[in-house]
């Protein structure tokens, strides 16, 4: 029989009884069954058409794999008020590791931001000479500095916490939702899809996603923070 997509065969976390899979040590098999359009046992192991980021044949503990596959978050800060921008930089300091990138987009505060950021290798500043840009235009300016993963876009009074990063990680990795955009502030975007659709060039990223979903007849990848709260319950 041809393979549906992914298989739990030989996965470290596959739980079997009498040579047939019954569960998953990570507790996500029920989610796989619910979210997959195809999910069935083939030769003793579940096969399905969703992507499980945790599948491995290496000897790892549950805690190790959950930490290893935790979503990589980057940050874009749109600077239109230097005091508020500096406050945002302070507020995310504990959330930023060497694997995260932080990019600040500004039109007039390059010097003050440079003094604040110093020589941190994963912090970047983009300086634009065009006034009255939209937040979306600032996003496009900065994305060449951002690596794959997901990006949180922060502007003026926006706030983000470890709790909400955990919720997004749960929503994607554990609940297996296909997330391309959280549309209410602070915005969260899937970096690969954002770059593939060329951001907001010619048409907003949200509208491009709508067209893509309609063309491919797939479920919406656009969510709100309320959706995240409801589905994760964290």
What is the role of each PLM region?
Residues 56-91:
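N-proximal low-complexity "stem/linker" segments adjacent to membrane-targeting elements
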Residues 99-109, 127-128:
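Short beta-strand/loop segment that forms part of the nucleotide-sugar
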Residues 90-99:
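Short, acidic, metal-binding catalytic loop of nucleotide-sugar glycosyltransferases
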Residues 129-146:
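Glycine-rich, basic loop-to-helix element that forms the pyrophosphate-binding segment
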Residues 155-159:
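The conserved acidic donor/metal-binding loop of glycosyltransferases
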Residues 1-66:
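Cysteine-centered metal-binding/redox modules
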Residues 165-180:
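Conserved donor-nucleotide/metal-binding helix-loop-beta segment in metal-dependent transferases, i.e.
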Residues 151:
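Short aromatic/hydrophobic "clamp" motif used to bind/position activated sugar donors
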């Amino acid at each position: 029989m041809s393979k549906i997509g992914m298989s739990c065969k030989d996965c470290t976390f596959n739980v079997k009884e009498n040579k047939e899979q019954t569960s998953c040590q990570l507790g996500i098999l029920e989610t796989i069954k619910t979210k997959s359009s195809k999910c069935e046992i083939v030769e003793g192991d579940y096969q399905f058409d969703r992507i499980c980021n945790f599948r491995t044949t290496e000897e790892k503990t549950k805690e190790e794999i959950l930490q290893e596959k935790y979503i990589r978050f980057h940050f874009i800060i749109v600077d239109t008020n230097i005091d508020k921008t500096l406050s945002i930089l302070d507020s995310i300091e504990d959330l930023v590791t060497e694997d995260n990138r932080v990019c600040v987009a500004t039109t007039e505060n390059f010097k003050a931001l440079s003094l604040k950021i110093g020589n941190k290798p994963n912090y970047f500043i983009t300086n634009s000479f065009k006034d009255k840009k939209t937040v979306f235009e600032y996003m496009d300016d900065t994305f060449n500095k951002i690596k794959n993963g997901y990006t949180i876009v922060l502007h003026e009074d926006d706030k983000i916490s470890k709790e909400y990063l955990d919720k997004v990680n749960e929503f994607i990795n554990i609940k297996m939702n296909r997330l391309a955009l959280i549309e209410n502030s602070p915005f969260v975007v899937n970096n690969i899809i954002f770059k593939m659709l060329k951001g907001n060039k010619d048409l907003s990223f949200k509208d491009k996603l709508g067209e893509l979903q309609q063309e491919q007849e797939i479920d919406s990848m656009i969510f709100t923070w309320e959706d995240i709260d409801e589905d994760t319950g964290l």
